[in-house]
Amino acid sequence: MRQFPSHPIHPNRTPKRPPFMDILSQMPPRADHRIPYGKDENQFGDLWLPHDTRTKAPVVVFLHGGWWQSTYDLAYTGFLADDLRNHGIAVWSIEYRRLGNPGAGYPGTFLDVANAFEFTRTLAATYPLALDRVITSGHSAGGHLAFWLAGRHHIPETSLLATPKPGLAVHAAISLAGVVDLRLTRDLASGWIFSHDKPLVDDFMGGSPEQVPDHYRAGNPGDLLPLGVPQFLIQGAEDNQVPPDLPARYAANAHAQHDTASVTIIPGADHFDIVDPTSRAWPTIRDIFLRASKP
């Protein structure tokens, strides 16, 4: 049974079911198309299209979780992608280089994600995608990357993460238990998730905020506020992987920068219920996607 590696924030709280037990015991649905956006074997995405292709569909650019590690891939996102496309939303689920893959971390993973996001315009030349309604969304570590995409127009031009001015606008950003602020994650989690005696955030970013401040200024969504788009932060009340105070703390900082950010805490849901379309939590989450995708 696969689960994201961590030491639970709530060590005395027993999850009501083993993470991923239901969705990983089944073969995920197949996407309509698997399309490379780069030359590396990890630079591809799965495209899910609504059955009615007569009109252009809003599109969710989705980033999977797994603490940016190569042990975890996009396969499990097939379940939510299939559900969203059945409700009229296209999904471009992105794979990217993760820790353990050559060139991953800072800046490689960020550049992969930026290139895959901009590749949506290429997809729209062939498939009926509404480029004025592109939503970035992600689960866990993927939530960090999704919100980073929404804020990268603020990246300093001298940064390694600076790319030509983004040509594709973000309509809204949705975090599913995302680590949307790396500084807050390190502080609130008290370094509860480690690799080689240091927080995994530091592995991914190339050091701590004190060691590589420029990396965090360019790669942390909290440093890129205001994002300038509606932001939706969704988390299960029983989540034992992501700091429970993170969504509210992030939203408060966003509001202070005059951004629009809402927090939805779902009673009884854990870290994985919110990406499982068979869970009780999912109808609430689907409704947020549907509302966010409207013009």
Predicted feature locations:
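N-terminal cap/lid segment of alpha/beta-hydrolase-fold proteins
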Residues: 4-55
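Mobile cap/lid helix-loop segments that gate and shape the active-site cleft of serine hydrolases
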Residues: 24, 30, 40, 184-223
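Short, surface-exposed "cap/lid" segments of acyl-processing enzymes
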Residues: 52-55, 60-83
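Catalytic nucleophile-loop/oxyanion-hole region of alpha/beta-hydrolase
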Residues: 72-81, 92-133
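Primarily recognizes the serine-hydrolase "nucleophile elbow" in alpha/beta-hydrolase
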Residues: 118-188
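Short beta-strand/loop motif that positions the catalytic acidic residue
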Residues: 227, 233-235, 239
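Conserved alpha/beta-hydrolase "acid-adjacent" motif
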Residues: 240-249
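Catalytic histidine-centered segment of alpha/beta-hydrolase-like enzymes
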Residues: 269-279
